[in-house]
């Protein structure tokens, strides 16, 4: 059996994240991902190199994006002989792409690879009416011009109504925010705790920018030099003034302030074998040790939509002989402040850990001072497929700065899924 190799995280690059319909309103997925890729090429002197592979993806895609990642490679200064493919696992896309590339490096199939993702809600795909689509296909199948005209004469004004992207789970009809509101009610997560976590995210990220932390993590794009969702002057008073966004009654606790906004952006990470990195004189910030994905039955199983990482982490810990407390940093994606707090509360709940996770004892509490120490999605924003790359690069840099340590990544995703990983130095 092939001896598995350690997978080095060499570094990352992203463009600043932007709130939807802002600076990137006219930027396509391809333009943003290519910009992030070009920045990575420049940072690590990859010009003209044939990379093992590039794996990336987007949650919201136009039909023109059917070969998105490969087109970005062809539009970059990488060798055109670099293979590339698309990945999509909702908000877990970027991290899942990194795990796919890492597995090939570990097995010796490739020496290096690039992984990440991109998303835009500003340039969201708007489809043709389903009735119009079927009529056009029927007309295309018709043999004669007369038959084609007969079909096209069935067109009516309602066929011109466009098909807009839906903000809801197909199986339930509820938005992610509505699902998370139900989770917050189930786990009795107070509004004040959610607002406090949101405030800490903004404060931590503002401090990181002030110290120049992001200088080697991103490259400017379309005039933007930092994430424009960041609010350095945010306060609990400002957060408390916001109205509930998903539940209008007095039960509502999720607001625009403690939930991530719709965001545009792209991110990538460069991975490689130790030998490849050293041969090229590239840094090794940390190592991607292992990953685990999970899914829950949020439709019929009485489980919260965004609780899958709660299930993935204990499997990951057991396989690696670790406990939840064996980490120096915790990077938990802040889709909503309530999701993070539900996750932490579930791991501390003995009955839940026994009946749902099959554990003899609860995983326990974490040291909150180690959680999202440079800020996370509530401050940066959340371009769905791009969040994983941002988190991997940020955590690897944290471990490199510390000189040692171990970090845990947890990312919830639509469809009741979650992707988790361990990074160590």
Question: Model segments located where?
Answer:
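Short, well-ordered amphipathic alpha-helical segments that serve as non-catalytic structural scaffolds
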Residues: 29-44, 68-72, 97, 176-183, ...
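Conserved catalytic cysteine-centered active-site region
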Residues: 58-113, 156-158, 171-174, 233-261, ...
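Flexible glycine-/small-residue-enriched beta->alpha junction loops
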Residues: 112-182
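N-terminal extracellular/periplasmic Venus flytrap/periplasmic-binding protein-like
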Residues: 13-15, 25-35, 43, 156, ...
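Conserved beta-ketoacyl condensing-enzyme motif
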Residues: 25-113, 117-143, 212, 218-228, ...
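Condensing-enzyme catalytic core mediating Claisen C-C bond formation in acyl metabolism
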Residues: 1-27, 151-166, 240-311, 319-320, ...
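Active-site pocket-lining segment
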Residues: 296-379
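Active-site-proximal alpha-helical scaffold in enzymes
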Residues: 89-119, 127, 184-213, 268-275, ...
